[in-house]
């Protein structure tokens, strides 16, 4: 992963440098098209590794021992060990406002059969949630009103195998305002998080914009970083504006932010709630 991050990185920064080295943390902004491309190239060129595209229906069990996985087409792939990298796909539901649709992430289906299968084997499950911000068209942003934010002067790679990395793109910074917060509050009654529609627990250090407004009501603004998602795309990630509020509220809120007054939304923000299995069940 470190090698792939170094190879596809657009900007590299060390976080928390105002404090002691023990909490310094490397961060990279990566090209969303190049990273998976390089990952595929690596996997497909790895010896003794076979990559199969298929949907898994259940884990095959024989006399309380794993025998492999069974696909939706009925094919069994034999194995003495199975590692599930489920992400947000197990019984995933995507929310924008009060509308929920099945999905692991935008434009991709969720997996329901694996959760049922593991529950039938005696595993216990819970629900988690995370979210993502809107993406906007770079050509609709007024960059003249924004401050530019670059990477480190001497960026450090993640992998010891990488001799050096360089910053390719800069980001741009703006902030929300009290007007933005008032607009977003109008949609709180249709927030799946505040209404109880989403019961899953969210990430501790990456709250949604509505959560930040609610929890830190004394703050009159919150930082927004506009990050281009790749060298060959005009899609810009609105970092700091993760939300599951209704589309009209998202649009009105974004248009109240300096530099985004005329922004065109390419994809709306959404939350995803999904199953996870308690880690203390691992042996």
Model-found features: residue ranges?
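Core beta-strand elements of the Rossmann-like FAD/NAD(P) dinucleotide-binding domain
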Residues: 70-81, 86
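A conserved hydrophobic secondary-structure block that centers on an alpha-helix together
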Residues: 59-65, 71-75
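Long, low-complexity segments enriched in small/aliphatic residues
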Residues: 147-230
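A glycine-rich dinucleotide-binding beta-alpha-beta segment and adjacent secondary-structure elements
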Residues: 237-283
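Flexible, glycine-rich loop/tail regions that form catalytic "lids" or insertion modules at the edges
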Residues: 2, 8-12, 212-213, 224, ...
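Flavin (FAD/FMN) cofactor-binding core of flavoprotein oxidoreductases
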Residues: 131-138, 185-186, 196-208, 266-279
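Hydrophobic alpha-helical scaffolding
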Residues: 25-29, 104-108, 170-174, 199, ...
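Conserved N-terminal/central alpha/beta ligand/cofactor-binding core
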Residues: 1-58, 85-105, 109, 113-115, ...
